[in-house]
């Protein structure tokens, strides 16, 4: 019995040891060489406290580095396209749908939607998108009057990061409700002496947060700022070194056994040694016997290109795009790889499109619709009908391989896996617009047939 109990105890203790040692995290037990670097990862910093400096650094990179600047151009073209987000109202009442869509289109003009008459709605879309990625946040202010609604884009720098008041629960220029993360007021710094507060009900604060309690956004470039700076610094250093290496061909060295302090006596012209520092094609010059030229070896860095390419890959990954899209380098790309990379990018772009529509377009349209109701340009019944039957359509993309993808869509429709509406939606085409275009095509075909018929009749009469 004792032996049996001892064996049971041993099994239990071994089980406990196995369970206790089941999880092992190397980063929590670093060696002496890596301990200082690993411990630096444990230093906690408040994202809101880093918002201002990251925004400043990201703004500098967006104009100082060509690839980062090109990335922002890519964003606007791929996410917003040629027309931005297009309103689509589908209440079942065609007259009402056209009325609202036309009224919204008129309001999008810079004279109607901007309090300063400078920016139309597409300009606001572009600036909000760039601010969201570069600054990590964008602020839209509803400027209301009795009969109109206008939108003002507030610079993130104007929301005073340095304005804090613990008693009033104000941090980084934003006042929240007591014991809550719901904002009450935003404080805008107009000048050193002028600080105004705007109710949160009149502000759309679009941001991407890391933690729920975060008041300010963090730049999308935050994780790649240091890598971009290092790569750019190395590129400039290597360029400067190459310039110096190409400018300095070599040196003149004294031969062994010849000892003198200077190249001759300054007062005696006959003792001066003439050193040739110029060269021209087809000419040769005699070199003094006491001097020997030593040429510098050519400078050809070998690891620079690899470092820059690997860094660009990491930066592109952090931005959600492929290396070839980020750099424009298509040398190592084939159809399969570029197709896979493009599909992944488009998923990212679609998420951003839907995020913008949720946070910006829907909010603005609902507020605009409310003003239409208050000014009696809509009845309550029409308001409710439109409120539940509107959407914004983002742009679609061209096919990577039209033959294969059109064939795949045709088979999917034939087998019932897809609908024509779904295929049109993927292309960013509105169904109503598509049907109208089909009707126009039918009219064109009928006219062409009439013309051809007249030609045939005329030919038959002549014969």
Name each region found by the language model:
Residues 117-141, 300-400, 452, 456-463:
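C-terminal amphipathic alpha-helical
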Residues 206-337, 341, 381-383:
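Extended, charged amphipathic alpha-helical segments
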Residues 100, 104, 308, 312, ...:
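Short amphipathic alpha-helical coiled-coil/interface segments
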Residues 1-87, 462:
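N-terminal-proximal low-complexity accessory segments that begin disordered
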Residues 91, 119-121, 142-145, 241-249, ...:
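Short coil/turn segments at secondary-structure boundaries
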Residues 66-215, 412:
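Structured, mid-chain assembly/scaffold modules that mediate subunit interfaces
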Residues 54-88, 124-132, 221-241, 356, ...:
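Short, Φ-rich (hydrophobic/aromatic) sequence segments
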Residues 2-5, 288-294, 300-301, 338-351, ...:
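Activation/maturation switch segments at domain boundaries
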